[in-house]
Amino acid sequence: MELPWLSLTTFTLSLLIYFSSTTQAFKRCPNCGSTRVPYPLSTGLDCGDPGYRIRCDNYGSLWFDTLNGSTNPIKTIDPSGQRFVLRPPGFEQNKCVSVDIKYHGIQLDLNLPFNVSCSNTVIIMNCTKDGLDAYSSQGFNCSDNSLCHKFLNANLEARGNCRGVTSCCWYKTGASVNTYKVYRARPDMCSAYQSFMNLDLTIPVSKWGEPAVEILWEAPREPVCKSQGDCRDLLNSVCSNDSTNLGQKRCFCKKGFQWDSVNAVCEVNRCSKRKSCKRWSNLPLLGGLAGGVGAILIAGFITKTIVSKQNRRIAGNQSWASVRKLHRNLLSINSTGLDRIFTGKEIVKATDNFAKSNLLGFGGFGEVFKGNLDDGTTVAVKRAKLGNEKSIYQIVNEVQILCQVSHKNLVKLLGCCIELEMPVLVYEFVPNGTLFEHIYGGGGGGGGLYDHLPLRRRLMIAHQTAQGLDYLHSSSSPPIYHRDVKSSNILLDENLDVKVADFGLSRLGVSDVSHVTTCAQGTLGYLDPEYYLNFQLTDKSDVYSFGVVLFELLTCKKAIDFNREEEDVNLVVFVRKALKEGRLMDVIDPVIGIGATEKEIESMKALGVLAELCVKETRQCRPTMQVAAKEIENILHGI
């Protein structure tokens, strides 16, 4: 009876010994005090990677040395995120001057594998006129109502050291692999600065937390070696030539193992064989299906199966009556969110049988007509394109979305009709056309809106659009991602107030899940590059598109225009280059640029800075719609 038990024990111990040997870390440095020092960070020549040098002092504290003799204490280290947090310097006693001004602030050596993350919001204070002019032209927000003034008035340390100081700016740093400075402090420009990490601009200054600077490190490569003996601490590796650097050798993992840059080990490559990879990669999915997300996925699968069967019946030349039956079933689920189910007779009468004279617009989804109901109400009627299954499902999707929302800056769905050959939606009528039409001509009043639209109204349009999108992201459960934010989907009513429209491509998010994986759809020029490349739809995808709309409002230029120079076809690239070169005002729409007051110029620059943040290539570096709405509100208060 004991032999099987002994055999099992022996087998288990053998496995433990095997796996522990395959995951032995390579030269990790000893703890500094009570703080673990993960690979590749190095506190000595015989551990870690020497290129990732930090210091451990005699008191058990870690320090990060930067250029010009400056050094900052390390507060926390996140090895999985490959980042650590520094404590920035404070003020000199009773002066609005940073302690490290003689070192010119925190600047990194561009030859080392560190860079500043995009999580940092930097406030610079005590600026000269030259400093304000220079930084304002570089895209910093130096307006009278900017965030930095709230900090000066509410932060106890700043208020004590900078009493009477009114000149300041703020900006977001980082967001690229070549950002090597937090701020270059100079007495002839701005002599004090402070940094905060993951700052929520909507909360009071008193709740900002302690100052911090987040630094990223690049994933380390395999250790350098001269002979196989140098690889003895990295099991399952062999010293061989580095094909990317002639004359250099590295400890490369043997076949069947792969380099784990976080733990500095050669781990078993469980996906080296297709079957094995498939088996292991399914484990997280099976765990997820056990929860609420799994229920949603299962429901989606069932729905897709039903729809697929219906599509096959349609393909078999059966009548559209079966499609209408499917729609009727779907709509009955959401009927409590609709004001009314219209008859086919009512719709035909309201639109004069879809007369061309009532046609308001058309697109891939179908056509939109103006209609008049018997009670005198003017409505907009959207009809799916005949024979186009995709447009039908977009309309059904729009019903499912709009039945769940109600906001003054979102177009209101009044009802639907499923008696006609194609499904129809009925909306409130928004009489002043789209923002696109007004910017580029053909709008509600005939000529372009910009002949009489001042900067304040443009800011109000931006603010109301942001509020509508923020409602979708923050107040809906689950969140809703619009997926097609653009100037032609922003309607303007008789008071030029915003109604965000066209939810045919919108998607429901999943609570507590960072993104929805879906095929990239949207409009060229507005499409989030991360969404396009990775198929990960998030709230930040809408933020990117909104940033493009802000650029349109500022410049009166189209998102994509092949009449511009080849390198400037994309509006984001065009304006980003102007911001980087400090000449934003050169590309501002002359209608608001020429003759603008100093405060208006500051407001335009502040909006340009916000727009540039919204179109950051990395979604984590973009603000939320709530933060964007709050910042535009602050800009509005300044003019």
From Swiss-Prot:
Q: What class of enzyme is it?
A: transferase
Stretch forming the signal peptide: 1-25
GO cellular component term, pick one = membrane
Query: Any keyword Cytoplasm?
Result: no
Q: Which Pfam families match?
A: PK_Tyr_Ser-Thr (PF07714)
Q: Where is this protein primarily located?
A: membrane
User: Which GO molecular function, any one, fits this protein according to its record?
Assistant: protein serine kinase activity
Q: Which residues form the Protein kinase domain?
A: 354-639
Per UniProt, ATP binds at L360, G361, F362, G363, G364, F365, G366, E367, V368, K382
Q: Where are the transmembrane segments?
A: 283-303
Active site: residue positions: D484 (proton acceptor)
Cytoplasmic domain ranges by topology? 304-639
State the reactions this protein catalyses. Answer: L-seryl-[protein] + ATP = O-phospho-L-seryl-[protein] + ADP + H(+); L-threonyl-[protein] + ATP = O-phospho-L-threonyl-[protein] + ADP + H(+)
Extracellular topological segments: 26-282
Q: How does it sit in the membrane?
A: Single-pass type I membrane protein
**EC number(s)?**
2.7.11.-
Record localization: Membrane
What the entry lists under PANTHER family is as follows:
LEAF RUST 10 DISEASE-RESISTANCE LOCUS RECEPTOR-LIKE PROTEIN KINASE-LIKE 1.4, PROTEIN KINASE DOMAIN-CONTAINING PROTEIN
Q: Which family does it belong to?
A: Belongs to the protein kinase superfamily. Ser/Thr protein kinase family.
Give a short account of what the protein does. Putative serine/threonine-protein kinase that may function as a signaling receptor of extracellular matrix component.
What is the protein named? Answer: Wall-associated receptor kinase-like 15
Task: List the source organism.
Answer: Arabidopsis thaliana
Taxonomy of the source species: Eukaryota, Viridiplantae, Streptophyta, Embryophyta, Tracheophyta
